[in-house]
Design a protein with these regions (language model features):
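C-terminal beta-strand-rich structural cap/linker in extracellular carbohydrate-active enzymes
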Residues: 701-743
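A low-complexity, Ser/Thr/Gly/Pro-enriched, surface-exposed linker/loop concept
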Residues: 54-116
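A detector of low-complexity, intrinsically disordered, Ser/Thr/Gly/Pro/Ala-rich segments
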Residues: 4, 8, 49, 79, ...
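Prokaryotic Sec-type signal peptides and long signal-anchor helices
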Residues: 15-18, 167, 184, 346, ...
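Catalytic-domain carbohydrate-binding cleft regions of carbohydrate-active enzymes
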Residues: 28, 34, 96-712
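Compositionally biased, intrinsically disordered low-complexity segments
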Residues: 14-20, 96-99, 743
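Beta-strand-rich N-terminal accessory domains
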Residues: 21-73
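Fungal secretory targeting signals
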Residues: 1-22
Length: 743
């Protein structure tokens, strides 16, 4: 069985040392040693003859450079070009000693000192320290400190650390990565942004025989393109990390979450059925809830993102209008004239709870035609509660399309937090809602003229920290509320440690198509990678959110690519067998999308999927209570977590996954598909997979072809598992096996 180690931090290159050979090994405690081989110029950390980390012989393990990268974009969309100046070309090690350290298990660390050389025309001092922390004695902690240098026009501002790899090693995690399973041969930036490689970042890496993460939140970049090495760039001169070893990948996730935290438990009411995403006001919401109950759809809640009102925004082409929200965080008097009473009536009359929507923006509602009670934008402007711009000497305006003037809350400002906490208490939580989608978090501007009230570093460095501060802030307010224990608080942007402050991650915003990079397939890949990154409880917008547009044609004057009833139904199947909650979304252009309530057939399909989700409730709950809560293990598990020795399993991203340990799932993620080829992972041929719909049992290590008509995603019971919790789902299978769903 392979071992699983963990490396933490942001690192780079190695070179020649000037250290004598009188000593080559220094103890850290717990049987762990730091070894330095002068002849090969290699540093390694070893425990019980197993290497936790090593560097590349004859190469720098640390480097630094000057140069300000070129960033373009704003409003959640960022791209960058590396600018390196005077990157240090060589390195020496001049001294390795034990030093006293209070937080070390044995009261000391191993300190490595030396110089980075040929940094332009200067040499730069550095120190790297390793120790076993008292609080977490199952790992090695480290920190790196690099001096800036003495050339004012060439001060170092980023560091690089390089450690050894091998050609067959694979890398997983690193947050919301949408397009591939292993990160090998990729360059992954860690920066919170809207979409693309690196989106929804969470700087954590799980490797085939190692795992790593950083403690800090500056921009970093993981370069896995070298077959024999991994280089991590970090945009600061100090960084800390951990190196760990576990006996399997699931246990490495436990060790990771022992440090970053585990997600709080989801309330049990989410197991009871669907969370209906609806827009349109009280009458429409109540009508759809009633229809759902008639359709035998288990309805747990409604999610009403338009509770604060909507306005229209021009689409890229044609005459189509996109529905946008008013970010003023008070109930809209036109759509929800009796909001407080309506929320309570849904709870009392139908047993349906209500979820709302909030983001860290406040918009100017002066042009809101149906009126408002407070203009939070004007209040925040007067109080100085938003992120500022020193060039305009005013609020840093966030643009999210035409017709929206908004600012982003400055969470470094205590006055902002006090003011907005009062808004949340009086205008959001006061209505006995049971949860909120806490959107965005990735929009903090990074330009040099961005001003924050109380932060010593610049906005660029703070950008990745904002999602965590947003999660900490909202949970601190929610904890004061009477219904806190039943609340669902879900986010889609995060940074290291955010997971302990939210009980659900949402992998939005997918396009309403079948694609790999940003369609339904990407939802599976992101949930898998986020699970490895410490986010055990996740879900996607059922049906997707973003409408894609093409240039208009005679047949399609708007250019909008509407959501089909087929993808809506298949996405519902995916949600039922993959996710911690079952929540739908109308999308940003509802009128071009098939909705679950469009007609009797779409509602029937949706209700069926909701019943399937509910039938899995007891099985999911025992996973969440016994494994996610205590060990940090994800609900949805990439096959590599159980089969790192299976080369095919290591490359599976969206095609299939485990739901807990006892169910293996292959969802239908392509149109007009009613049969699936499914690879059943594992090298142990005694391992079995029983197809729940046909009863056919197969052995591991082969590809099988199974029927997958609408309503019947390929689900297999692993090794004839049985339990009272699983039997509820199998009862559903027996009851519904003859059901025919037509689209």
């Amino acid at each position: 069985m392979p071992s699983y180690s963990t490396y933490l931090g942001t690192f780079s290159v190695f070179a020649l040392a000037a250290l004598g050979e009188s000593q080559s090994s220094w103890t850290l405690g717990q049987g762990i040693e730091v070894n330095w081989q002068s002849s090969s110029q290699q540093l390694s950390i070893v425990q019980a003859n197993k290497t936790l980390l090593d560097t590349v012989p004859g190469q720098n393990f640390l480097s630094a450079s000057a140069g300000k990268d070129h960033w373009v974009g704003a409003n959640g969309n960022f791209n960058y070009t590396d600018v390196d100046r005077n990157r240090c070309q060589s390195q020496n090690v001049t001294r390795i000693t034990h030093s006293s350290r209070e937080d070390s298990i044995n009261g000391e660390d191993v300190s490595i000192q030396g110089y980075l050389q040929n940094c332009g025309d200067q040499s730069i001092g550095y120190t790297m320290s390793f120790w076993v922390p008292k609080a977490l004695p199952d790992r090695v902690a480290f920190d790196v400190n690099v001096e800036p240098g003495h050339k004012r026009n060439a001060l170092m501002n980023k560091l690089y650390l390089t450690f050894g790899s091998h050609v067959s090693e694979d890398f997983y995690g690193l947050g919301a990565q949408a397009s591939f399973a292993s990160m090998k041969n990729q360059i992954i930036p860690i920066f919170s942004r809207e979409q693309g490689v690196g989106r929804g970042d969470q700087p954590i890496t799980a490797l085939e025989d190692s795992q790593s993460w950083e403690e800090d939140t500056a921009f970093s970049e993981f370069d896995f393109t070298n077959p024999d090495a991994v280089t991590v760039r970090y945009d600061a001169l100090t960084v800390g990390g951990h190196v760990m070893q576990a006996d399997n990948m699931l246990n490495s996730i436990t060790m990771l979450t022992d440090f970053v935290g585990k997600m709080p438990t989801l309330p049990e009411w989410v197991d009871n059925g669907a969370i209906l995403g609806i827009q349109g006001g009280q009458e429409k919401v109540e009508r759809i809830v009633k229809e759902g109950l008639k359709q035998d759809c288990p309805v747990a809640a409604v999610w009403l993102q338009d509770w604060s009102g909507t306005h229209s925004q021009e689409a890229p082409y044609g005459n189509m209008q996109i529905s946008r929200l008013w970010w003023n965080w008070e109930s809209d008097s036109k759509l929800y004239p009796t909001w407080t009473e309506f929320v309570q009536d849904l709870r009392e009359e139908y047993g349906v709870t209500t979820l709302a929507y909030i983001n860290p923006f406040v918009a100017n509602v002066s042009s809101k035609t149906d009126g408002y009670r407070r203009n939070l934008f004007l209040e925040a402007t007067k109080g100085g509660y938003m992120v500022q711009n020193s060039t305009t000497n005013g609020t840093a305006i966030i643009s999210s399309g035409k017709g929206i003037q908004a600012g982003i809350l400055d969470l470094t400002n205590q006055k902002t937090r006090t003011w907005f906490a009062d808004v949340l208490r009086k205008q959001v939580w006061n209505t006995n809602i049971s949860g909120v989608m806490w959107d965005f978090g990735e929009y903090t501007p990074i330009t040099p003229d961005t001003k924050l009230a109380n932060i010593s570093s610049d906005a660029y460095f703070y950008h990745n920290q904002y999602p965590r501060d947003w999660a900490i802030f909202q949970r601190s307010v929610a904890k004061e509320m009477p219904l806190f224990e039943e609340m669902v608080t879900f986010h889609r942007s995060a940074s290291l440690g955010s997971n302990r402050h939210l009980n659900l991650f949402w992998v939005g915003d997918q396009t309403t198509v079948w694609g790999i990079n940003d369609g339904i397939k990407s939802a599976v890949t992101i949930m898998g990678q986020m699970g490895i990154s410490g986010y055990a409880q996740s879900h996607s917008d059922l049906g997707g959110y973003t409408t894609a547009f093409h240039p208009p044609t005679v047949a399609n004057s708007s250019g909008a690519i509407g959501r089909s009833a087929e993808i809506l139904g298949r996405w519902g199947e995916l949600a039922a067998v993959s996710s911690a909650v079952f929540r739908s979304h109308e999308g940003n252009v509802p009128e071009v999308n098939a909705q679950f309530y469009t007609n009797s057939s779409t509602y029937s399909y949706y209700a069926y999927n909701a019943r399937m989700f509910k039938s899995l409730g007891p099985y999911r709950r025992q996973i969440l209570n016994n494994e996610s809560k205590t060990r940090g293990w994800p609900l949805l598990r990439m096959p590599v977590l159980y089969h790192p020795d299976d080369s095919k399993a290591r490359q599976i991203s969206y095609q299939s996954f485990y739901l807990g340990a006892d169910l293996y799932v292959a969802p239908v993620l392509d149109p007009q598909t009613t049969k699936l080829n499914v690879y059943l992972p594992g090298t142990d041929r005694n391992r079995t997979y029983t197809h729940v719909w046909s009863g056919q049992t197969y052995h591991a290590g082969q590809t099988v072809r199974v029927d997958a008509p609408h309503g019947k995603p390929a689900v297999f019971v692993v090794n004839h598992a049985h339990s009272p919790e699983l039997s509820v789902f199998l009862d559903f299978v027996r009851k519904e096996n003859g059901t025919v769903i037509r689209v």
